[in-house]
């Protein structure tokens, strides 16, 4: 299977590390020109250089897309986006009854509204030009709700509705809009999260095993997913090979969601 994204410009939000960086690398390997995004210029430049070091074409856009102002600044630098990947997200473990109104608002704003803002801005030009892609990185927590992350789960559930709704809005234009349901994934942020829940003195491999057994026992992989495994699905969805896939929520969850349905 050959995926060729030559001549396409991709924007991956929150792509200085973890899943976002892996997605940027995957798209660049397939020939896309990738805009690496984050809030800190130094980290953005470092990530873009890493992508270029793999032989890809990448440049940095250091703007905070969780805000209206930051989004406007970014879009001024990127008047045309062929592949939009809304990867930006925050998460944290908080006991259900202790999640404050402010924490609810922040998760919904950063994980949900920020994606809506970018899709809304990019979709008109995408529809005018035909073939384009908008992909949202959702989470297994949208389907299997952890009691310590209800606010996060709500925001990621919203992303599934956002993708389905905008896919309907783009019907017949050649633009596809999908979400990817990412399962428990091995990133620096997730390592920190794991150590919030298990003994901090444990070596990482042991801590990971304890976390999976105690907090994610449904996983059929029985390990954390690697970011590149999420990126493989995103690269496919961004390609012409996925031309008939739209309005969907595709799972890369290691069998974590106990369902035979998508």
Please place each PLM-identified region on the residue numbering.
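Short C-terminal tail/terminal secondary-structure segment
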Residues: 3-6, 144, 234-235, 241, ...
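Conserved glycine-rich cofactor-binding loop
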Residues: 9, 16-17
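Short, small/polar-rich loop/turn modules that mediate ligand/substrate recognition or access, typified
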Residues: 171, 176, 245-247
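Alpha-helical segment proximal to the catalytic Tyr-Lys
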Residues: 124, 168-169
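Active-site helix of classical SDR
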Residues: 119, 155, 163
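Substrate-binding pocket helix/loop in short-chain dehydrogenase/reductase
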Residues: 95-96, 100-105, 215
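Residue(s) in the substrate-gating loop at a strand-loop-helix junction
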Residues: 139
């Amino acid at each position: 299977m050959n995926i060729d994204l030559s001549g396409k410009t991709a924007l991956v939000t929150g792509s200085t590390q973890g899943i976002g960086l892996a997605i940027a690398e995957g798209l660049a390997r397939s020939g896309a020109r990738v805009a690496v995004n984050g809030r800190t210029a130094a980290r953005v430049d470092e990530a873009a250089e890493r992508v270029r070091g793999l032989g890809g074409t990448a440049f940095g856009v250091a703007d905070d897309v969780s805000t209206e102002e930051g989004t406007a600044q970014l879009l001024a630098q990127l008047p045309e986006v062929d592949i939009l990947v809304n990867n930006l997200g925050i998460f944290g473990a908080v006991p259900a009854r202790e999640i404050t109104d402010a924490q609810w608002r922040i998760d919904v704003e950063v994980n949900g509204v920020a994606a809506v803002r970018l899709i809304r801005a990019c979709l008109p030009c995408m529809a005018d030009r035909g073939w384009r892609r908008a992909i949202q990185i959702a989470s297994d927590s949208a389907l299997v709700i952890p009691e310590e992350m209800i606010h996060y789960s709500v925001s990621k559930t919203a992303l599934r509705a956002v993708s389905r709704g905008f896919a309907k809005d783009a019907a017949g234009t050649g633009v596809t809009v999908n979400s990817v349901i990412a399962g428990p994934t091995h990133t620096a942020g997730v390592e920190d999260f794991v150590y919030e829940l298990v003994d901090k003195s444990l070596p990482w491999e042991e801590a990971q095993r304890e976390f999976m057994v105690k907090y994610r026992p449904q996983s059929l992989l029985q390990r954390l997913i690697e970011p590149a495994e999420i990126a493989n699905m995103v690269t496919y969805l961004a390609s012409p090979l996925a031309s008939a896939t739209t309005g969907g929520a595709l799972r890369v969850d290691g069998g974590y969601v106990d369902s035979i349905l998508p």
